Structures are given as structure tokens and as C-alpha cells.
Amino acid sequence: MGQKPIVVFPSDYFSSKTVDGEYMPERNAALGTGLFDCALFSYRKWEEQGILSLNFSGNTSGEEMSVPAIYRGWMMSPEKYCKFYMSLLQKGIRLITAPQEYKLAHYFPDAYPYLKADTAKITIYPLHSKINVEEIKKTFGRFMVKDYVKSVKGTKFPAFFDENTTQKQFDEAMKLFYSYRGDILSGGICVKQHFILKKYGQHSNEWRVFYAKGIPCEAMPNSEQPENAARPPQNLTEKYKNLPSPYYCLDYAELETGQWGILESGDGGVSGLPHGQDIPAYYRFLHKFLFANKV
């Protein structure tokens, strides 16, 4: 039997030999399947010094005979992920997601051309640029603001803006947005059409689907909705199984109209597993479709 594929996890910030607690259930599950080896990298050294210090007891043979791997961990900018990818490759570990594939799924505007038939319309702006709210209102009746990766929902920043929003109100709100995102701002500003979501009590009906080389994993509820909530249509989740990345996820939501739309895209390695996900089954799924070369 050949070398097992590797799952690369971040370490605890203060202990490079201990997996970050958030990912301990995943590491245990991955090892428990018997299908993967696991490697840790010092998250502190990586964040503070940009140095990849790897804790891995297995064998690698250098760049030419590199062992395939996936990353499961915290988000990185595309630039930092590229450095991470190359640093691992020099150590004989080849992440299955190349830097350009990571960026495509991680930055929503990059994924947008592949999703636009079933997602919110967007307009993008450079960070800290002046945004003319009157121009936006000509395109969108109701809209929200995020950077290329994240919104600041759950804060004092408005969940959406509409035709009554003045330029002054918008400018003041954007100051708040920048203060919340701080030094983790990503890419640029993305103004999105605001979807009105169907509610089941207090909860929307959102589902996350991971994809591995064109095969969708089981859709999992992702917004604490009740068990009787509708599931996303299979023809919709199948429609988006061929984005140009081997490992990504999409978030689907039921709209107030009863239709369905795509809320977000994400790189598979930095997207969290929904509560209730069968983690060992998830890792068996990844092994079968990412590494076993069979369907």
C-alpha cells in the first residue's frame, strides 16, 4: 500500500505539538478512518513570522515525489495560502488545491461568474474607495455589504441598506464596517443584492454542501432550522458540482418566494463543518473522491 494522503491541521497557538482544539474532532476522525496521516504546523510561527514549522512523523520524498494532502484549518489570504502551498511542497507535501483554485472559491467575486444564474447580483469596489450609494440604488433595491470573503453580520453594522439610505448614513456605516474587519479585510468591497430568506420560526433555511472533484457530499443544515425544513433541490446542488476547484463548498438558502439561491462559496479546506456532520463519514467521502481515483 502506498503513502496515505495527509491532512494538514494548525496547531494550538501555544503548543506546536497539539492540534488546535477546534480541529481536534476532525483530526481524531481522520486518523480513526485509517485512511489518512495527519500533520501539524505551528500556527503561532506561521502567523507571527511566516515560517512553516511542521510536525509530521511520516515520510515524504521531496517535491518530485510529493504526497497529496488537504488543508483543514483557518482562513488565509490567497497570497498567504500560495506561500503555504509552496512551503509544504518544498517539504514533500502537495496540497490538492492549488493557489489559484483556493482563490477562486475563497473570493466570492472570483466564483461569481460560475454561480451568477442562482446567486445575488454583485458590484465590487477597491478597499477604502468612495462608494456612491445613489449609483448602487439604481441597481439594487435592497443590498448588503461584505468584503470578498466575510460580512460583519451579528454586529451593529446594518444587515442591509435600501432606497432610503442616504450617502451620509452609508459613509458612517462603512467606517463601522472597516473597524469591525480591521486587519482581516479581504480583497475588496462586495456590494450584493440582499436576498430575503424564508424563515422557520426565528431561523432561516441554509444548507452547506461540500464538493470533492465534482461529487457533492450530502447537504447539511447550517442555520439551526427545524427538521421539517425543506432541503435544497438536488438538481440545484448538482448544477454547481464542476467549479474549477477540486475541493470547495457552497451555501444554499431557501428564499421567501420559495425559490432557492446560493449565498456563499468557500474553499473546502477553510470552510467549517456544519453541526451534525458525521465527521468520520465526511473524511471517508473526501478520501474516496479526492484521493482514491474512483467513483
Segments the model singles out, each with a brief description of its role:
Residues Y211-I215, E256-G258:
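Short acidic-glycine loop/turn motifs at beta-strand connectors
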Residues E26-A30, Y81-M86, Y112, V133, ...:
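Short amphipathic alpha-helical segments and helix-helix/interface helices
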Residues K241-S245, E254-V295:
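C-terminal active-site "lid" helix and adjoining low-complexity regulatory extension at the edge
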Residues I189-Q193, S245-E256:
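A short glycine-rich, hydrophobically flanked beta-strand micro-motif that places a catalytic Asp/Glu
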Residues G2, V7-K17, E63, Y85-N205, ...:
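Active-site nucleotide/adenylate-binding loops and adjacent lid/helix of ATP-dependent enzymes
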Residues E79, K83, Q202-W207, Y247-Y248:
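Short, surface-exposed coil-to-beta transition loops
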